[in-house]
Design a protein with these regions (language model features):
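N-terminal auxiliary segments of SAM/dcSAM-dependent transferases
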Residues: 2-180
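Conserved SAM/SAH cofactor-binding pocket of Class I
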Residues: 197-221
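Sensory/regulatory domains in signal-transduction proteins
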Residues: 173-175, 186, 192
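S-adenosylmethionine
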Residues: 147-155, 161, 181, 189-191, ...
């Protein structure tokens, strides 16, 4: 597609202090653009926030950075409590295993969507102008590429995932089965599945050791 015919993504619009604002919606998972936005700070209670996100309203966080993280954690606890209560009333014997699996996956997807509605605004250089916010510019650049000429709105939860991936990449993740090879660590990029199931690597190592003939074919499942 030529540059002249390129379709730009629809921006997120919201009212703040009586003025209309808009910014690019950043979502690595491709989550839908929120229809409504509520601008909030540290004075917002968790109960009101829970009601808003359950209705599909995005909360644009303008308060303290760490308070924003605590808000997401509080919402997660409320969602899990409601899920557990619903599960306690269900009758598992009446639900087929396949349906239980799909219901679980659906609940997890819904949980991610709701928690993703606590959002923040990043400046054009990926700077986060919140109190006590760390400098995330390098982490964002590694995950999303070089900054553009405009800011963006991103889920706080996704942003924390970007930072976690950056720390993994920088510090590495120790894998015992790789002892003796380089530093015994892997340095995954953003978007790589969490490399915490080290037992899988150990199984591969043992399988290779048990074969007398060389292995020239492998399957990544």
């Amino acid at each position: 597609m030529s540059e002249t015919n390129k379709i730009e993504p629809e921006p997120l619009n919201w009212l703040e202090s009586g003025q209309l604002h808009h910014a690019r919606w950043q979502s690595a998972s491709g989550s839908a653009l929120p229809k409504t936005v509520f601008v909030a700070d540290d004075t917002l209670s968790a109960s009101v926030a829970y009601k808003l996100v359950c209705e599909g309203t995005a909360i644009l966080w303008r308060g303290d950075f760490h308070q924003g993280r605590q808000m997401v954690q509080s919402l997660a606890r409320r969602i899990d409590k409601a899920r557990d209560y619903k599960a306690s009333k269900a009758k598992p014997q009446d639900i087929a295993p396949k349906d239980m699996y799909y219901a679980y996956r659906q609940a997890q997807a819904q949980r991610a969507r709701v928690l993703g509605l606590v959002v923040v605004e990043l400046a054009a250089d990926y700077w986060l102008p919140l109190r006590r916010a760390p400098d995330m510019r390098v982490a964002c650049t590694q995950a999303w590429g070089e900054p553009t000429d405009a800011g963006c709105i991103v889920s706080l939860r996704e942003l924390m995932g970007v930072v976690a991936a950056y720390e993994w990449r920088k510090n590495g993740v120790t894998v015992p089965a790789l002892a003796g090879l380089s530093d015994g660590k892997i340095h995954p990029y953003y978007g790589v599945f969490a490399p915490i199931r080290n037992e899988y690597v150990e199984l591969v190592v043992k399988a290779c050791q048990q074969r007398s003939a060389p292995i020239d074919t492998a399957f990544d499942i």
